[in-house]
């Protein structure tokens, strides 16, 4: 496999490293593995999984923070042909129970704790006679003695169940407008194609050193770092949770050449030139960002003051893979808000991504393809990076008749000729809180029984630090006391909702805006909340 070949080619090169303060977060010392050690460690864990009765095709939930063991899990599960379903550590029992019911896992792999999160206790909520709880440090470990008999067992298993690069490797999770996380199956080949697009966008070089601060459970980290690192023999340094001071220290001390960071952090660093200048970032070549719109002034500051280019990424677990780099434009305004129309046969964009993917924009009413600048429509995507459909759903309206994925995102064609997409909004209602995607419909459903309210729905409101936060919009029952923010939080926490999804504001209305079918018109709620902000009626 890819890892074995890199272990032979670069046995002593660093493959993956923990952050230096891991002991405070997990009670374990930081770990650093070379490519040879990663190959060996993942083989040991693969043998331990086989010992537990896990076989090819079995599904395993993995709830781990950004630590070395998570990278080992990806490699180990791949070696036995099983399917890994990574989930954020913020997920609570509510989300885990839904995921478990959807994929019928044979095991959940986790830690005792991560900071204040008691991960093993949360995982116990879904374990039963058919689901094993496997805790690193107790049930699984990287330091077991090599057992020739177990190695032979693994070899025999691999011969009996050879890996097909088109078979599912991961089931990641994305929040949808239906109100619950949806499973996104992705194969080895889908990840490899995404990795090649990301490597091209970031101009990755053999032997690069990456600093990863996004949770290693979705597109940004798996496609942006994990697979490119295995393809090119690059090193991954891990970071979690976000600590700006530690992040800067790691950039310097680990001699990082490329990193991804959320726009909120880059904005903060662009405003903190004294802090930035305390460190030596001479090895850093460029920085990627995404998950929310970028600020042109931030891109310009990094270029003019720090000598670094910022690359704008736009992707999703489903396989959207767009990016805007210095090769596409030097204009900060354009790079912050637009993406080249890859996969449209446009001259000047000759690249792997332009050949591997297809994209187009269609009118949301007629479905006709839009080709002229200034027109807005839904972005459709196809090609080697794109998944085949959500797990456990019919996917009838998810793909066009000619096989394109309906992204649910609105884009405008820009330029003369129209060579760029500008993200114009969302067909979907997803709330993006600091890069964590939250389904408002999921919270609506849980809040239906809230005492004191006759109607309730949540919507996004703008926040300088997180981008968006959750606002609970209530219609208070006659003669009832208005529910407080604590009432809402307690009610949701008792149902197992993850804390990052909790509303952080309440607004009361005489009635909720609805369409003729009775569906809440969330965009009207958002406008009303925004208007109250402008009028100072908080």
Predicted feature locations:
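Conserved pre-ATP/AMP-binding loop-to-beta segment of ANL
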Residues: 11-14, 150-173, 180, 187-189, ...
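AMP-binding/adenylate-forming catalytic core of the ANL superfamily
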Residues: 91-94, 98, 108-110, 259, ...
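Conserved ATP-dependent adenylate/AMP-binding module captured primarily in the ANL superfamily
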Residues: 91-125, 194-211, 243-257
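Conserved AMP-binding/adenylation subdomain of ANL enzymes
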Residues: 192-209, 216-258, 268-274
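Gly/Ser/Thr-rich phosphate-binding loop
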Residues: 256-261, 274-340, 358
């Amino acid at each position: 496999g890819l890892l074995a070949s890199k272990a032979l080619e670069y046995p002593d090169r660093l493959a993956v490293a923990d952050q230096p303060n891991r002991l405070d977060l997990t009670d374990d010392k930081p770990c650093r593995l070379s490519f040879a050690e990663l190959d060996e460690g993942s083989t040991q864990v693969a043998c331990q999984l086989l010992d537990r009765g896990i076989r090819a095709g079995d599904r395993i939930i993995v709830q781990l923070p950004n630590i070395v063991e998570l990278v080992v899990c990806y490699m180990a599960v791949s070696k036995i042909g099983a399917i890994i379903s990574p989930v954020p550590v913020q997920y609570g029992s509510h989300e885990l129970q839904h995921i478990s019911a959807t994929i019928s896992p044979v095991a959940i792999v986790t830690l005792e704790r991560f900071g204040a999160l008691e991960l093993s206790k949360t995982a116990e909520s879904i374990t039963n006679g058919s689901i094993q709880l496997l805790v690193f440090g107790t049930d699984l470990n990287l330091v077991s003695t090599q057992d020739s008999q177990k190695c032979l067992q693994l070899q025999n298993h691999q011969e009996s169940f050879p890996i097909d690069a088109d078979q599912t490797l991961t089931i990641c999770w994305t929040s949808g407008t239906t109100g619950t996380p949806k499973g996104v199956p992705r194969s080895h080949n889908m990840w490899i194609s995404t990795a090649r697009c990301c490597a091209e966008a970031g101009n990755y070089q053999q032997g690069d050193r990456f600093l990863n601060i996004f949770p290693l459970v979705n597109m940004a980290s798996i496609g942006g770092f994990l697979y490119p690192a295995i393809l090119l023999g690059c090193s991954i340094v891990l970071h979690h949770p976000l600590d700006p001071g530690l992040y800067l220290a790691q950039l310097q001390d680990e001699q990082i050449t490329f990193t991804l960071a959320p726009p909120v952090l880059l904005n903060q660093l662009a405003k903190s030139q004294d802090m930035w200048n305390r460190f030596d970032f001479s090895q850093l070549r460029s920085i990627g960002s995404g998950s929310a719109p970028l600020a042109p002034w931030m891109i310009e500051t990094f270029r003019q003051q720090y000598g670094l280019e910022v690359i704008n990424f736009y992707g999703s677990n489903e396989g959207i893979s767009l990016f805007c780099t210095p090769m596409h434009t030097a204009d900060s305004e354009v790079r912050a808000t637009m993406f080249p129309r890859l996969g449209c046969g446009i001259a000047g964009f000759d690249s792997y991504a332009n050949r591997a993917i297809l994209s187009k924009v269609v009118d949301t009413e007629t479905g006709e393809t839009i080709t002229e600048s200034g027109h807005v429509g839904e972005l459709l995507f196809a090609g080697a990076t794109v998944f085949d459909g959500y797990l456990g759903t019919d996917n009838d309206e998810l793909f066009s008749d000619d096989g394109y994925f309906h992204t649910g995102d609105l884009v405008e064609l820009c330029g003369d000729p129209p060579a760029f997409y500008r993200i114009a909004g969302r067909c979907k209602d997803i709330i993006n809180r600091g890069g964590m995607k939250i389904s408002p419909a999921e919270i609506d459903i849980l809040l239906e029984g809230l005492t004191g309210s006759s109607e309730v729905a949540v919507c996004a409101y703008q926040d300088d630090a997180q981008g968006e936060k959750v606002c609970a919009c209530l219609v208070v029952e006659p003669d009832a006391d208005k529910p407080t923010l604590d009432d809402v939080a307690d009610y949701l926490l008792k149902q197992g909702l993850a804390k990052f999804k909790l509303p952080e504001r309440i607004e009361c209305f005489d009635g909720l805006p609805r369409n003729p079918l009775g569906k809440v018109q969330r965009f009207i709620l958002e406008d009303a909340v925004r208007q109250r902000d402008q009028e100072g009626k908080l």
